Amino acid sequence: GDGFGLEAALWFQQDGKEAVEDVTFGRSNAWDQVRQETLAVRSSVGLWETTGFSKFKFSGPGARAYLDRILAGRIPNAGRMALTPMTNPAGNLIGDLTVATLGAATGAAEGPASTITGGATGNTRDGEEFVLFGSGIAERYYERWFDQQLPTDGSVRCETLGFETAGLSIAGPNARAVLEKLTDADVSQNGMRFMAFT
């Protein structure tokens, strides 16, 4: 299949069989293969690409307060992630997002946001950056919403990361065992906690 300019495998056919799905209103010929893939992840490990997700970085002294206003859920502490809906003032759903909080800003200081220090509210923590992940096909929709809501004083900077940032998702009971073979970093339960972000 393809979505938002990226081609992605929807399912994998057995060796020796043609990977063509017979589309029906019932279960297609892909059903058994998708079931086997799902069971493999549940019992062992699976990996899939998440590059096609929309990705945005927010920074500046007003970033936390801005995100706290447009997101319905709690903004996590540094090094943590949280799932949160984004709603309009009437409570209608704009998008279902994941927000991650980084510590001090990692990018070079530039533009009006970098010249502002401190913050007008107690909800500001100097130097924080935030990364939001959401539906890839809604990237432009999210961009328009963010732009409409951004303060005009330059206290918040929003950057669309697009395809510059690739992503992989690994899941299943053997996920940590695979990661241990790929890195010297501590990927134990204590070293890499659930919903951690570094």
Regions found by a protein language model. Give the residues of each.
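Glycine/proline-enriched, intrinsically flexible loops and inter-domain linkers
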Residues: 1-111, 115-198
